[in-house]
């Protein structure tokens, strides 16, 4: 039987039943599903979050089925505690059609999506929520509120995005960054992008050694390909303590980063080759294409999160399946539960 690479709704039900101590019998056609290693990595991450305190999360403009059910599903796993922000009549209409009981969820009524984004950021600044989740609105609309100079959620770090991915042909989950926020990052931007990803990987990785591959088209440094210069500089910045808590090597071509055989065939000696935890892409275009190629051609399981703001931002798209939405919330839960003592966040109590 072909192995499953998607953590589908039925299996989410089975995991939830296990957490609640109840009995669950899946439909006959998928009885005892045989999941591949990619799905197992994310199932393990979901189960490891058991016992975490749920993250009080502002869900921005959840006026369609996917965004509302994604938040509700994550709440069923006790991963988040949603605060639904948007036109109340539209939220209630979607809930009614999809048999969702809103009694347990706070709903804040605002008229438009941009008001919902602004309200979510306001709640985060007041520490009344500890995460933000994108609903049925454009990413630019949400992020413009997040990065607003006076009223946004900026920190001393550059805001960046990370995809946590798993494929059956690679032995462990890995991060691709930045494939969604920074279009053509400078060297200084990339330093923050790398550090943001390192910090996240330390939160979710049980083996604390983190290895970072800075990607380019080739593994040699040449002025003809400027991204090789950035990669070499980032590697040296790690040597000098400007990037911390990881081994950073670059430039590395993609094959050298993920395959020790490919690296050895080219005479490359690197502790990162074949064992990378983080793949740092040259720019948004290359990263976005790489992530989507792995998803649609390599059957990758993936989740996404925005880092570097005052709170984690769960950034999903309309095409994302339910498992990606739930696991993206799990990433926010890991961040919150690893940092709440330091940040003294009041939300979630």
Swiss-Prot record:
Quote a single Gene Ontology cellular component term.
Answer: cytoplasm
**Entry's EC annotation:** 2.3.1.8
Give the Gene Ontology MF terms in alphabetical order. Answer: phosphate acetyltransferase activity
Give the catalytic activity: acetyl-CoA + phosphate = acetyl phosphate + CoA
Enzyme class label:
transferase
Q: Can you tell me which family this protein belongs to?
A: Belongs to the phosphate acetyltransferase and butyryltransferase family.
| Protein's name according to its UniProt entry | Phosphate acetyltransferase
Q: State the organism of origin.
A: Rickettsia felis (strain ATCC VR-1525 / URRWXCal2)
